[in-house]
């Protein structure tokens, strides 16, 4: 009798434990899936995630400070909102983890929207861009067809890499599609002759060619057309709306055009146009 009672009690205790454990797990899951985002207030910190090897959008200046077109836009937004601006360099292939953990508030660094529309909560696009090939002027490479059997460098986890994956009929003709850590490495490889071409953003390519005074040229071929936007964690419409409205204000009063003139010698922004 005592053995039977002990068995009944043991089974009852086990069932209760399993039930409670499952219930706790479900509640935790529900709690995590219902993350709420709120507007930032004056004095709050606003952390911008960026690739520090991506001039002119975001990079380390000669004075050792972080600078660039996108970072200047972010600074102006923070100034108008009364936020504390923080620029945080990140590994580009870790950007999603940084955003998900709350280590950064947004990704703002020549961030391509195309193909990622459902992955983030986006601002309106503020720049048009193309993915292109950069080659040496004396290479004899005149079109994308001349890249057959050649070494083409591309940054890891970049829009150019994704675009070339979509154009397998072209990339399959390359001798080697070499993935590098950043565009600076690719351009140095191009300069040394260890790479024949670099697939990259035309906005960045034009700036780099002028800055380096390099004998490079951009092929008249568009790998992909795209738009740049500011990417926030999925569902973070509150802060997105604050940033977006400030960018629209900056476009209206000419501040955005002024910053564009500084970096590109012309206004290439598209907000409010």
List the model feature ranges, each with a label.
Residues 52, 128-135, 202, 206, ...:
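Periplasmic-binding protein-like
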Residues 71, 86-98, 177-192, 226:
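Short helix-initiation/N-cap motifs at beta->coil->alpha
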Residues 52-55, 66-79, 111, 132-187, ...:
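Bilobed "Venus flytrap"/periplasmic-binding protein-like clamshell domains
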Residues 94, 110-119, 163-168, 191-225:
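A ligand-binding cleft/hinge motif common to bilobed small-molecule-binding domains
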Residues 26-66, 79, 140-151, 273:
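Immediate post-signal peptide segment of exported/extracytoplasmic ligand-binding proteins
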Residues 75, 79, 84-146:
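Acidic, polar ligand-binding/catalytic clefts
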Residues 24-38, 42, 84, 159-178, ...:
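Ligand-binding clefts/hinges and TM-proximal coupling segments of bilobed small-molecule sensing domains
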Residues 23, 71-80, 150-151, 156-159, ...:
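Extended ligand-binding regions for polar small-molecule ligands
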């Amino acid at each position: 009798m005592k053995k039977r009672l002990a068995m009944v009690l043991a089974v009852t205790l086990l069932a209760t434990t399993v039930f409670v454990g499952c219930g706790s797990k479900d509640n935790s899951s529900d709690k995590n899936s219902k993350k709420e985002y709120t507007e930032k207030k004056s004095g709050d910190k606003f952390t911008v995630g960026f690739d520090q090897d991506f001039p002119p959008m975001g990079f380390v200046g000669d004075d050792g400070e972080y600078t660039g077109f996108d970072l200047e836009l972010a600074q102006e937004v923070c100034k108008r909102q009364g936020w504390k601006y923080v620029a945080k360099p990140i590994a580009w292939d870790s950007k999603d983890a940084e955003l998900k953990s709350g280590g950064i508030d947004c990704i703002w660094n020549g961030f391509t929207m195309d193909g990622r529309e459902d992955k983030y909560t986006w601002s309106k696009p503020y720049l048009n861009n193309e993915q292109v090939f950069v080659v040496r002027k004396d290479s004899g490479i005149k079109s994308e067809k001349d890249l057959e059997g050649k070494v083409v460098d591309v940054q890891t986890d970049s829009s150019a890499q994704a675009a070339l994956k979509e154009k397998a009929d072209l990339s399959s003709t390359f001798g080697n599609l070499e993935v590098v850590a950043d565009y600076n490495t690719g351009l140095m490889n191009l300069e040394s002759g260890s790479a024949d071409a670099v697939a990259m953003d035309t906005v960045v390519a034009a700036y780099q060619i002028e800055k380096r005074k390099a004998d490079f040229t951009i092929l008249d071929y568009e790998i992909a057309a795209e738009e740049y936007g500011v990417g926030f964690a999925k569902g973070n419409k509150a802060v997105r709306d604050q940033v977006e409205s400030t960018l629209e204000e900056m476009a209206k009063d000419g501040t955005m055009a002024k910053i564009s003139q500084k970096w590109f010698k012309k206004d290439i922004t598209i907000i409010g146009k």
